């Protein structure tokens, strides 16, 4: 279990309320696939991923990006028990999909970049970023739990 300060809880929940998951999700997953092209191997059923434009316009990428961000809502709702909230997803990504757990960190970085670009430095201040990155690190750890 993670010990969250009241300020961190407030920052995470407050920021989450400002994030358009249906906008950030597709952007973040597309960014991951463009910036870290080796991650594309996990999305072979998504169709054309041959260029950045193809990735950005790919409806399967957009749909899965939304799914990922809606999945993060589970962590926001379960701040005190993120690891258990993500047990089934961890098992699926480890045992069925064989996703390199470092890819979760890469996607978390892309989510952070997209949120920062959308909300700007006034809303996404350094202290908000610190809490959000701690939150994403806990989610990444929970997703990687079955790998250990």
UniProtKB/Swiss-Prot annotation:
Domain of life of the native organism: Eukaryota
Domain Globin: 3-148
Molecular-function GO terms, alphabetical: haptoglobin binding; heme binding; metal ion binding; organic acid binding; oxygen binding; oxygen carrier activity; peroxidase activity
SUPFAM superfamilies: Globin-like
Keywords: Heme, Iron, Metal-binding, Oxygen transport, Transport
Cellular component terms per the entry's GO annotation: blood microparticle; haptoglobin-hemoglobin complex; hemoglobin complex
Xref: Pfam families: Globin (PF00042)
Residue numbers binding heme b: 64, 93
Gene Ontology process terms (BP): hydrogen peroxide catabolic process
Function (record text): Involved in oxygen transport from gills to the various peripheral tissues.
Subunit field text: Heterotetramer of two alpha chains and two beta chains.
Protein name per its UniProtKB record: Hemoglobin subunit beta
Lineage: Eukaryota, Metazoa, Chordata, Craniata, Vertebrata
Gene assigned in the entry: hbb
